A protein has these predicted regions:
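Soluble or luminal CAZymes and related metallo-dependent hydrolases
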Residues: 28-35, 81, 123, 194, ...
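Accessory N-terminal region flanking or inserted into the helicase ATPase core
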Residues: 31-36, 44-46, 62-73
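A generic structural signal for well-ordered alpha-helical segments enriched in polar/charged residues
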Residues: 38-42, 91, 133, 223
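Long, charged, glycine-rich C-terminal linkers/tails
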Residues: 47-62
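Switch/communication elements of ASCE P-loop NTPase nucleotide-binding domains
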Residues: 58-190
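Acidic, Mg2+-coordinating catalytic modules of nucleic-acid enzymes
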Residues: 166, 170-246
Length: 246
């Protein structure tokens, strides 16, 4: 958890500050802390200057997000968890490779269960590429139920687990629409059954040249789903084409 990470970081920063004073070198960086700072920067673009603020009681970890310095308890659970994850992995790699100038390039296997937990959906798209960037020589083995996470990796990197059965993914995933991934990988419909059936019914009305009824049903559906919904737009186009005999 991030509480233990903060305590470790504070202790290391105390050592780093003492060495800076003793060596009269205020650019000196503790190897383990440098690895943590580099990992956080790689995993969380826009975050910088991770440090302990000792002018408050008790001392608190702060980080610069954009142009604003924030305490860790002002961040979302997901942001705090990512900082703790990056810090813990980087710390372990630095400890395992004393004297290394590039501890984040340590080879190893990283296991993460339900990587999307507590993360804002926008971070689902970036968390895997960011981990790969932060720890380029580590093998990641993660579990997820997020179609956004799957859309950030190729199908060849995905295995579907169903009980004790494991099967490959045969349809493309990287860059795919998340509704397609829900349907093709998770086997979950993108819509509630009622709305999915209404879309099919409107298609049948159009194919049967019952355009006025199709327009009425589509207007009702658009009020529910919005005029910008992909199926609403598709059905409007289909009606327009049918009206001119195309």
């Amino acid at each position: 958890g991030y509480a233990r990470f903060i305590e470790w970081f504070k202790n290391r920063e105390d050592v780093e500050n003492a060495r800076r004073v003793a060596n009269r070198d205020f650019d000196l960086q503790d190897v383990e802390l440098r690895a943590v700072r580099d990992a956080v920067a790689a995993l969380m673009p826009g975050f910088d200057t991770l440090r302990i603020d000792r002018e408050v009681a008790p001392p608190a970890m702060v980080v610069t997000k954009g142009d604003v310095e924030l305490r860790l308890d002002q961040l979302s659970d997901g942001e705090r968890n990512l900082i703790a994850l990056a810090g813990d992995l980087a710390r372990r790699m630095a400890i395992a490779n004393p004297g290394s100038d590039a501890p984040l390039e340590t080879e190893g296997v990283i296991l993460i269960d339900e990587i999307e937990q507590h993360l804002h959906p926008a971070l689902h798209f970036t968390v895997i590429p960011s981990l790969q960037r932060a720890f380029p020589k580590a093998q990641l083995i993660v579990t997820t139920h997020s179609p956004q996470v799957l859309s950030s990796v190729p199908a060849s990197a995905i295995v579907v687990l169903d009980g004790f059965d494991a099967s490959p993914v045969t349809s493309p995933t990287r860059g795919r629409d998340t509704n397609a991934i829900l349907r093709e990988v998770f086997g979950v419909p993108a819509r509630l059954p009622e709305q999915a059936q209404e879309v099919l019914d409107i298609v049948r009305l159009i194919d049967g040249d019952r355009l006025d009824e199709a327009r009425t049903r589509l207007s009702n559906l658009a009020e529910l789903l919005s005029e910008h919904d992909v199926d609403v737009l598709r059905l409007r186009t289909k009606i327009d084409f049918a009206a001119v005999g195309l």
